[in-house]
Design a protein with these regions (language model features):
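Extended, histidine- and acidic-residue-enriched regions that form the cofactor-binding/catalytic faces
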Residues: 18-80, 84-92, 98-102, 110-128, ...
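Positively charged n-region of N-terminal signal peptides that target proteins for export
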Residues: 1-4
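Hydrophobic h-region of N-terminal signal peptides that target proteins for export
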Residues: 8-17
Length: 299
């Protein structure tokens, strides 16, 4: 009788295996056991891409923190995971500044491609890369998704929030405090300065900046931008500054609360669960119809 009971317990115990519930959707903070369990439910993962560059008196990693917050909220909305991605992508016009980390678009693409191949091997087939408030990002991430598809025949997705957000037709008020919400979600709210943290002299360019009439004219004609023309900022303080600052830490916290609400509303409007289902269907169509028709060898 005792032997039969032991055998029964051995057979039944795997059914009642105890696994800690997800305490976060950050892939890097989960255990091997948790990741394995998560992969039984989803193959979706979100990866932010940004830059560390001068933003005047604002944090130099601002344009990474924004997509990081989007990635976290998208993971929550879809039941997927998210993870740190590429913080050091090509900065573009700000590369001359002491706080700007320079890396070529090709180096960024190569790094992300290694990451994408690893994630695919691990079981994350639906990968979503996100950038926000960073004009040169498509040079890195757009190349990634196309080259990765040609190499693996697996479609991964790039969401450029700068070009996507206009589709939602948001008012300025509906996105007025998202930068504060993003830093709060990322746990970096104290990085955003308060009014009076910097003096007037330290908040402005070192002196008068002569007008670049040629660049101004090209912009007016529609022939400028990070993807179309080489240029640098004329002063390290002339990029990304914000004079609308909270007066107190309490006001900053209130702006952060509002910003989080705005970001969550944006994610709802994006209909990410529907998008992830569509990505799965597109992948299946590719594998079942297009690949057999045009390829005889595995990638």
């Amino acid at each position: 009788m005792r032997r039969a009971l032991i055998i029964l317990l051995v057979v039944v115990s795997p059914v009642f295996a105890q696994v800690r519930k997800l305490h976060t959707r950050d892939f890097t903070r989960l255990s091997q056991v948790q990741v394995g369990e998560a992969l039984k439910q989803t193959d979706v993962i979100f990866i932010p891409v940004g830059a560390v560059e001068t933003n005047g008196i604002q944090p130099s990693n601002r344009d990474y923190t924004w997509p990081l917050a989007y990635a976290k909220l998208m993971a929550e909305e879809t039941g997927g995971l998210y993870m740190p991605g590429l913080m050091w992508s090509y900065p573009g016009t700000t590369s001359l500044a002491p706080s700007s980390i320079y890396s070529t678009p090709q180096a960024g693409t190569a790094f992300l491609k290694e990451l994408a191949h690893s994630l695919l091997r691990q079981g994350f087939r639906r990968q979503v890369y996100i950038s926000a408030s960073h004009g040169p990002a498509p040079l890195t991430v757009g190349t990634l998704v196309r080259e990765f598809f040609e190499e693996t025949r697996v479609p991964i997705l790039y969401i450029n929030m700068d070009t996507y957000l206009p589709r939602l037709q948001l008012t300025a008020e509906q996105r007025s405090r998202t930068i504060y919400g993003a830093h709060s979600i990322a746990g970096h709210i104290e990085d955003l300065p308060l009014r009076g943290d910097y003096g007037a002299k330290e908040s402005e360019p070192a002196g008068a900046i002569p007008a670049n009439d040629g660049l101004t004219a090209l912009g007016r004609l529609g022939f400028s931008g990070s993807l179309t023309l080489g240029s640098w900022v004329p002063d390290v303080m002339s990029h990304g500054g914000d004079r609308d600052l909270p007066a107190t830490s309490a006001e900053r916290a209130a702006w952060a609360k509002l910003g989080e609400e705005q970001l969550r509303a944006i994610i709802k409007k994006m209909r990410m669960p529907e998008a992830m289902d569509a990505l799965r269907k597109h992948d299946r169509y590719t594998q079942e119809l297009i690949v057999p028709k045009f390829f005889t060898k595995k990638p």
